[in-house]
């Protein structure tokens, strides 16, 4: 797994990967944080694609994921997943966050994409504690890629240095980097 999981500090919208994962809200209509940044960088085509998904299925439930085109992003597709709002850890948040990562990975693999970039899902306005969220992310992705050929490359894209070090430390502890 050493060559399959990477930590990058920077702007997820600039990454030339097959799939960028968006930490979306249930409406898929964009919002703040990484969701807003992805929608702004992708342009109106992404919003149009999200509107079509909403017309077909309504809101995207927490823990679920949908895939759309990427608009003006360098990626080929965007997987929109809805992570849980942190409510103290007693509302099944851990399982819902794991599901958000797993369902995203399943869509990437099912569509034969080889590379994917994840933000730190639910750690912004949704308030999930960063360390706990990173542990779930690293564990879930590591377990998935040991059992599946795709995606070949997974990137954890961290906005700041502190979060990047957190992911690097967790990957080192697991022997993945």
Swiss-Prot record:
Annotated binding of substrate, by residue: 11-12, 25, 33-35, 122-126
Which UniProt keyword terms apply here?
Answer: Hydrolase, Stress response
Q: Which SMART domains match?
A: A1pp
Organism listed in the record: Escherichia coli (strain K12)
UniProt protein name: O-acetyl-ADP-ribose deacetylase
Describe the function of this protein: Deacetylates O-acetyl-ADP ribose to yield ADP-ribose and free acetate. Down-regulates ribonuclease 3 (RNase III) activity. Acts by interacting directly with the region of the ribonuclease that is required for dimerization/activation. Overexpression inhibits biofilm formation via an RNase III-independent pathway. This inhibition is RpoS-dependent. Overexpression also results in increased susceptibility to apramycin.
| Keyword Hydrolase applies | yes
Q: What class of enzyme is it?
A: hydrolase
> GO:BP terms for this protein?
purine nucleoside metabolic process; regulation of single-species biofilm formation on inanimate substrate; response to antibiotic
The induction field says: Expression is induced by both entry into stationary phase, via RpoS, and cold-shock stress.
Q: What is its EC number?
A: 3.1.1.106
Effect upon mutating residue 126 to F: No change in activity
Q: Tell me yes or no: is Cytoplasm among this UniProt entry's keywords.
A: no
Family to which this protein belongs: Belongs to the MacroD-type family. YmdB subfamily.
User: In the record, which residues are listed under signal peptide?
Assistant: none
Domain Macro, which positions?
Answer: 1-175
The source's domain of life comes to Bacteria
Q: Which reaction does it catalyse?
A: 3''-O-acetyl-ADP-D-ribose + H2O = ADP-D-ribose + acetate + H(+); 2''-O-acetyl-ADP-D-ribose + H2O = ADP-D-ribose + acetate + H(+)
- One of the record's GO molecular function terms: O-acetyl-ADP-ribose deacetylase activity
């Amino acid at each position: 797994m050493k060559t399959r999981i990477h930590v990058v500090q920077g702007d997820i919208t600039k990454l030339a990967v097959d799939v960028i994962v968006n930490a979306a809200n249930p409406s898929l209509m964009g919002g703040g944080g990484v969701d807003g940044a992805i929608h702004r960088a992708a342009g109106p085509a992404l919003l149009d694609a999200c509107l079509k998904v909403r017309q077909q299925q309504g809101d995207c439930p927490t823990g679920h994921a949908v895939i759309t085109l990427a608009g003006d992003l360098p990626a080929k597709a965007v997987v929109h997943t809805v992570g849980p709002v942190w409510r103290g850890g007693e509302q099944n948040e851990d399982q819902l966050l794991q599901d958000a990562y797993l369902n995203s990975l399943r869509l990437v693999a099912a569509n034969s994409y080889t590379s994917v970039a994840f933000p730190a899902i639910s750690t912004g306005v949704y308030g999930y504690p960063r360390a706990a969220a990173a542990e779930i992310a690293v564990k879930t992705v590591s377990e998935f890629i040991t059992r599946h050929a795709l995606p070949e490359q997974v990137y954890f894209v961290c906005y700041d240095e502190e979060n990047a070090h957190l992911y690097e430390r967790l990957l080192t502890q697991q022997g993945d980097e």
